[in-house]
Amino acid sequence: MAPVVQQPAPSFKKTAVVDGVFEEVTLEQYKGKWVLLAFIPLAFTFVCPSEIIAYSEAVKKFAEKDAQVLFASTDSEYTWLAWTNVARKDGGIGKVDFPVLADTNHSLSRDYGVLIEEEGVALRGIFLIDPKGVLRQITINDLPVGRSVEESLRLLEAFQFTEKYGEVCPANWHPGDETIKPSPEASKEYFNKVNK
């Protein structure tokens, strides 16, 4: 069964490349933190390195928000390691500042509902998991289009805001923007401000 927002995220234990070495990584080790789990189809391709590099360059922004970034593919840990040893200018990913998970048996991709069975690769899924291990947001792209780091950060900040303050975030919300008190009467305050 595919994962569902508001339900516990599927647990996992996978071998990952972390700072150039192999380590076992589990979802449970990040309990108490936000987790952004992203899937890519294949190493040594075209859109995939652009995404990994973009998220790696923004990893400090995620860390400042108490969020751990993880990437996964159906490639082996050896493929991931080889890819980190190729310079970015040559299509590699170089040093990556988050764990990259090897899903060689496809269980992780299947559990998260992104596996294209006949091809043995994952769709471009992003899963935002809260500190309790509950799925809060799912986005799945078809293979040819990469994801936006800015949108991932915006969604993380919006969910964190709603958790902290109990208000809800309207379309295109960014930190500092007006929010909505979730009741028919109180919400009028927001709508009166933005719809003059």
UniProtKB/Swiss-Prot annotation:
Induction: Induced by oxidative stress. Residues 175-196 have a biased composition (Basic and acidic residues). Transmembrane segments: none annotated. Keywords: Antioxidant, Cytoplasm, Disulfide bond, Nucleus, Oxidoreductase, Peroxidase, Redox-active center. The keyword Iron-sulfur does not apply. It catalyses: a hydroperoxide + [thioredoxin]-dithiol = an alcohol + [thioredoxin]-disulfide + H2O. SUPFAM superfamilies: Thioredoxin-like. Its EC number is 1.11.1.24. Gene3D superfamilies: Glutaredoxin. GO terms for biological process: biological process involved in interaction with host; cell redox homeostasis; cellular response to hydrogen peroxide; cellular response to oxidative stress; filamentous growth; filamentous growth of a population of unicellular organisms in response to chemical stimulus; filamentous growth of a population of unicellular organisms in response to starvation; fungal-type cell wall organization. InterPro entries: AhpC/TSA, Peroxiredoxin, Peroxiredoxin_AhpC-typ, Peroxiredoxin_C, Thioredoxin-like_sf, Thioredoxin_domain. Residues 173-196 are annotated as: Disordered. It is found in: Cell surface; Nucleus; Cytoplasm. Substrate binds at T45, F46, V47, R124. Residues 3-161 form the Thioredoxin domain. Thiol-specific peroxidase that catalyzes the reduction of hydrogen peroxide and organic hydroperoxides to water and alcohols, respectively. Plays a role in cell protection against oxidative stress by detoxifying peroxides and as sensor of hydrogen peroxide-mediated signaling events. Also involved in the correct composition of the hyphal cell wall. Belongs to the peroxiredoxin family. AhpC/Prx1 subfamily. The active site is a conserved redox-active cysteine residue, the peroxidatic cysteine (C(P)), which makes the nucleophilic attack on the peroxide substrate. The peroxide oxidizes the C(P)-SH to cysteine sulfenic acid (C(P)-SOH), which then reacts with another cysteine residue, the resolving cysteine (C(R)), to form a disulfide bridge. The disulfide is subsequently reduced by an appropriate electron donor to complete the catalytic cycle. In this typical 2-Cys peroxiredoxin, C(R) is provided by the other dimeric subunit to form an intersubunit disulfide. Homodimer; disulfide-linked, upon oxidation. This is Peroxiredoxin TSA1-A. It comes from Candida albicans (strain SC5314 / ATCC MYA-2876) (Yeast).
